[in-house]
From Swiss-Prot:
Heterodimer of a catalytic subunit and an accessory subunit. This is Queuine tRNA-ribosyltransferase accessory subunit 2. Belongs to the queuine tRNA-ribosyltransferase family. QTRT2 subfamily. It is found in: Cytoplasm. Its cofactor is Zn(2+). SUPFAM superfamilies: tRNA-guanine transglycosylase. Pfam families: TGT. The lineage of its organism: Eukaryota, Metazoa, Ecdysozoa, Arthropoda, Hexapoda.
Length: 418
């Protein structure tokens, strides 16, 4: 992995260029990773993604918690001359990272043991040792992967739990560092420690004590429990910890923070020096029937962060979900149609939502890179913060609790959600 900084400023963070493997494409940072579930971009086939979302090479974020059942098949695939993990899941031409936890779903707490990390999968809880983890990484052969770590911490975690997470991570990583040479993939060193600056420093110190070339970048874990919890983080508590950590890291290695952080939080983290994020926020919005409508192109109009597809007020609204959006959903369909698809529980509903949300979110990152290059990130941040309104916009995502009963529909589809 090669990472080169093109520009850096105190106010706008840094603009970089990342080459994950020799001969591969270069990616501009800040970079958006494409979140997957079970090896697939949620609701989308490869053809739909590449024809209606993006034709450019992407970095796919694979998670062991949703793909652990593929280990045996991947062992045979790669031993037989398979072309790699992305080809196996039907997304050739894209690079990939293997991570432990699904950022889209809440990770249960507990189940920690001295030498074992709990991995919560679709089949239940699996026990993951350092040895077993490296065997699975060798089977998957990702382009780069996350080091094994105990990230079971959040803002409410006690000091004892935080210290255990750091100590256990050091023990896991001691084995990983010793045996990483058996895997032809780049390692990301995990930085854990909750919201405790001393614990974070200890975790960073352990990583930086390793010989040169032991890892290619950093991944920050342990700030939240994934899922919607990342959309409600208190940035006044988060940002000082991130700033404390970044000051202790060398500049020539990329930094990743997985999770469904809000657009505003992402802008503030970029200003702190974080380089990579994932698209789980767009997925969480789609899952809860919300179309992203926040604006990042400055104008004089007040904007809302979301369009609630479940809202009865749009059932006769025949305007696009977002005006001036060039995605398939907004060019071909209306708000009323999306509401109809929701009411009838049609699969096309989430497909159209994720097409729009990914298109919008990827355009947002294009705007971010443009703003960083011009040293105008603070201006963009303030616009995203208020959306031309008088107060700060709430970008947190609430779980959709509306349920449509088929029995209540009768012979038509006019039943209200309950």
């Amino acid at each position: 992995m090669k990472f080169a900084i093109e520009s850096i400023s105190k106010n706008s963070g840094r603009l970089g260029q990342l080459r994950i493997k020799d001969g591969g494409p270069d990616f501009k940072t800040p970079l958006l990773l494409q979140t997957t579930k079970g090896g697939s971009i949620p609701w989308l086939s490869a053809d739909v993604f590449e024809s209606h979302v993006s034709q450019k090479p992407q970095v796919l974020q694979f998670t062991l918690s949703t793909m652990d059942h593929m280990t045996e098949a991947l062992t045979h695939w790669n031993s037989g001359g398979g072309r790699g993990l992305s080809d196996y899941v039907g997304l050739p031409g894209h690079l990939n990272i293997l991570m432990l936890r699904d950022p889209c779903e809440t990770t249960p707490s507990g189940g920690n043991d001295r030498d074992i990390l709990p991995l919560f999968t679709r089949r239940g809880k699996e026990s993951l040792s350092s040895e077993r983890y490296m065997e699975m990484v060798a089977s998957f052969k990702p382009d780069f992967y996350e080091g094994l770590c105990d990230a079971d911490t959040n803002l409410e975690s006690a000091k004892k739990r935080i210290q255990k997470s750091v100590d256990r991570t050091e023990k896991f990583m001691h084995y990983i560092y010793e045996h990483r040479g058996k895997v032809n993939s780049t390692l990301l060193a995990p930085i854990v420690g909750g919201y405790n600056t001393f614990a974070r420093t200890q975790s960073i110190k352990h990583a930086r004590e390793q010989p040169a070339g032991s890892y290619g970048g950093y991944i920050f874990e342990g700030f939240h429990t994934n899922g919607l919890s990342a959309t409600t983080l208190d940035t006044s508590k988060l940002l000082p910890i991130v700033e404390h950590c970044v000051k202790q890291l060398e500049e020539d290695k990329p930094r990743l923070m997985p999770g469904a952080y809000t657009p505003l939080t992402i802008l503030e983290l970029i200003r702190q020096g974080i380089d990579m994020f994932d698209s789980s926020y767009a997925y969480c919005a789609s899952l809860n029937f919300k179309a992203l409508t926040f604006s990042f192109v400055q104008d004089a109009v007040e904007h809302a962060p979301f369009l609630d597809i479940t809202d009865e007020a749009i059932k006769e609204d025949f305007t696009p979900p977002l005006s001036n959006c060039s995605c398939l959903t907004c060019q071909k369909h209306t708000r009323a149609y999306l509401h109809h698809l929701y009411k009838t529980n049609e699969l096309l509903g989430p497909i159209l939502l994720i097409v729009h949300n990914l298109h919008h979110y990827m355009a947002f990152f294009e705007k971010i890179r443009e703003s960083v290059a011009r040293d105008e990130l603070p201006r963009l941040t303030e616009f995203v913060r208020n959306q031309n309104g008088k107060t700060q916009v709430d970008y947190s995502i609430a779980a959709n609790t509306k349920v449509i009963s088929k029995a209540a529909m009768g012979k038509g589809f006019a039943a209200a959600a309950v």
